């Protein structure tokens, strides 16, 4: 009888370990299967910038090297970007749809950027870096053509939406909006 009790304890412990192993390995698998959506980060920043007319948020969508070049050429580049991009785009949306309360978006689909498009982004980036560019290094490592539906919630006309395509690329490990498209 004591042998059976000892065997039962061992079987119970083994069963608990097996159940724990299945549960914990299943949880880890679930995390791995979740798709990395970090390519949407610059689109999120763009929408937040547009909603709040926030130039600093918008600048998160542009690599620092582009910003440095803009600053070299235009001392007031931030105010230029704000008036020429954010304010104009916001005004255009308001003239089309009415007074805007909220701007959001939904991802419709994404398509991997072609090797040709990535090469073009890479060449532009290296050109921007000039003498600082390492010709043996690849800076642009990934990219997507993301089709989104921009939703403008207005005071008078409810939700209005429009589809658009945004090109995003990954440079030095961070996602940005393409300056070429």
Locate the predicted segments by residue.
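Bacterial N-terminal signal peptides that target proteins for export
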Residues: 2-14
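C-terminal motif of bacterial Sec signal peptides marking the signal peptidase cleavage site
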Residues: 22-26
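Short, low-complexity N-terminal intrinsically disordered segments enriched in polar/charged residues
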Residues: 27-52, 60, 68
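Short solvent-exposed beta->alpha transition segments
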Residues: 59-137
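A short, structured loop/turn motif at beta-sheet edges
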Residues: 137-142, 169-172
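A short hydrophobic beta-strand element
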Residues: 140-152
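Short beta-strand edge/turn micro-motifs at domain boundaries
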Residues: 157-181
């Amino acid at each position: 009888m004591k042998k059976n009790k000892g065997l039962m304890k061992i079987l119970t412990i083994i069963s608990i370990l097996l159940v724990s192993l299945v549960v914990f390995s299943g949880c880890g698998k679930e995390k791995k299967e979740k798709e990395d959506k970090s390519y949407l980060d610059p689109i999120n920043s763009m929408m937040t910038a547009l909603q709040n007319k926030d130039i600093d948020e918008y600048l998160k969508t542009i690599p620092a090297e582009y910003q440095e070049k803009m600053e070299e050429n235009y001392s007031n580049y931030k105010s230029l970007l704000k008036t020429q991009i954010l304010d104009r785009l916001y005004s255009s949306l308001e003239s089309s749809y009415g007074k805007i309360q909220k701007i959001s978006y939904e991802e419709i689909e994404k398509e991997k950027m072609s090797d040709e498009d990535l090469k073009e982004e890479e060449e532009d980036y290296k050109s921007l870096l000039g003498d600082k560019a390492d010709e043996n290094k690849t800076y642009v490592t990934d990219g997507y053509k993301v089709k989104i539906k921009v939703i403008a919630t207005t005071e008078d006309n409810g939700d209005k939406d429009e589809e658009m395509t945004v090109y995003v690329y990954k440079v030095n490990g961070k996602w940005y909006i393409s300056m070429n498209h």
